[in-house]
A protein has these predicted regions:
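Acidic/histidine-rich catalytic cores and adjacent linkers
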Residues: 1-16, 22-29, 45-196
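Short, surface-exposed amphipathic charged segments that create phosphate/polyanion-binding patches used
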Residues: 29-40
């Protein structure tokens, strides 16, 4: 991330670096997955293979937003809350960080600072590492929540262009790929011959 910041600031001296909320929450999801794997390995090591097996099937329930959970996934989360407090705290840390980006201005900054304090005191090594990473990039995160910026639209266009590139595999020239991209993403709507 540092290389892109240096390049952007060299080209645009007055630019404000804003970090994408999706990627910040992805960091928290990765930290949560580290905790999940640690707990899973610990349960297997101490001989609780039944709980370990049940925990292994909970990955997607931990990753998803709470409002998108199925009944079965909600039951898995309830089981985690009852049987494994450290993993559930890691899940709550991830969800509270996600909630920071649903607010704007001073409220979001206050929520981020509260989250940083909680993560620092959590005694969960993966989230303490995440605390240091987010503290390092705090200015970019605050700029993002203050301005309400996201890379979501750019990411979706890039994904669509990669799909069109795969579709265009076998075209004789790159001009045909460019024409396909312009037709699909560029808003160009030529009149077709023989149609009114």
């Amino acid at each position: 991330m540092e290389w892109i910041a240096e390049t952007a600031l060299a080209a645009c001296e007055n630019a404000t670096l804003c970090l994408d909320p999706f990627h910040i929450v992805r960091w928290a999801t990765d930290a949560l997955d580290v905790v999940r794997r640690f707990v899973w390995n610990l349960l297997r090591r101490i001989g609780l293979t039944g709980q370990a097996k049940r925990l292994k099937g909970c990955r997607y329930a931990l990753w998803k937003n709470p409002d998108h959970l199925s009944e079965r996934q909600a039951a898995k989360l309830a089981w985690i809350a009852k049987h494994n407090s450290s993993l559930y705290r890691a899940y709550l840390l991830k969800e509270h960080l996600r909630l920071v980006f649903q607010h704007r201005g001073h409220e979001a900054v206050a929520m981020l600072d509260a989250w940083l304090s909680w993560a620092r005191r959590s005694q969960i090594p993966a989230f303490i590492q995440l605390y240091h990473r987010i503290k390092k990039h705090r200015a970019g995160i605050i700029a993002s929540v203050t301005h309400g910026l996201s890379n979501g639209l750019t990411e979706s266009v890039n994904t669509k262009l990669r799909l069109l590139t795969r579709i265009a595999y076998g075209f004789r020239s790159t001009d045909n790929l460019i024409a396909l991209c312009l037709l699909d993403r560029g808003g160009h709507c030529p009149r077709l011959p023989g149609r009114s």
